[in-house]
Amino acid sequence: DSLARNRDLYEFIVNVSGGNVRVAVELVSRYLGSPNVESERIVQTITETGSYVVPLHEFAKAALLGDYSHFQEESSAATNVFSVVYRDRREHFLSLLILGFLSWEGATRAQADGFISLHSTISEMQSGGFSPEQISAHIQKLTRRKLIESSERRLLETGQEILESGLPDSFRITTLGAYHLKRWVSEFSYLESMSFDTPIFDDRLREELNSPRTWQGSDKAHPSSMLTALVLRSTKALAWKKAASRASPGATSDSKGGTM
């Protein structure tokens, strides 16, 4: 009933599961058994009204947090796309830039089924000032977390595998990656969860967050709200900068791997 009446919930399950029935069932099971879901309230609502429509934010919270009170990536359906490997503030957005490039119709396709060559991806990211080591590390993580997939269907789970075989020749974004890019990163619940797992390299901002004066008064929000606003502004600024640099008449930005 919830899937029939809540299109956003249906979109979430289909895209996060990648169309895999087993993963979809796991998402539902995780929601039903999550300590972050108010089960008593749901049972009471069903008792009083005879039905309960699961809201997207409630279902997504269970997928984000699982059995924990704070985000733990290895046990979550979500990936922290703002994580870094090196102490570089710009790197917070490297995973998003890779996802954005792989979903861009203007990128040179290596194959007819949406794969983009590794060379094109690395060249594009290097034009933004990122090193091959940074780019490779993020590609490896995005592949392991199934936000992108390689033409060779390798998960790149170990550094030894990369040393022995190198990176695959081409990649494309998955529905899970597209959902992160086009939906999750603009939602407060996702950004709030990631704020506990994302280092802050800006000394001024870190001092401001740590200052008691920052949060005095009822009009001040949770510290993660400031990080949320900062991430949203920075992400949109980077996206617009990239879009402007590529802009041409008739250009499109829809993706074959976009959300359903």
Segments and roles (model prediction):
Residues 1-6:
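The catalytic "switch" region of P-loop NTPases
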Residues 8-22:
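A short helix-loop-helix "switch/interaction" segment in the helical subdomain of ASCE P-loop NTPases
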Residues 20, 54-58, 210-218:
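A short, terminal or domain-edge coil/loop segment
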Residues 21-24, 132:
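Alpha-helix N-cap/helix-initiation sites
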Residues 23-119:
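Winged-helix-like regulatory helical subdomains adjacent to P-loop NTPase cores
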Residues 106-260:
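Terminal-proximal interaction/regulatory segments of ATP-powered molecular machines
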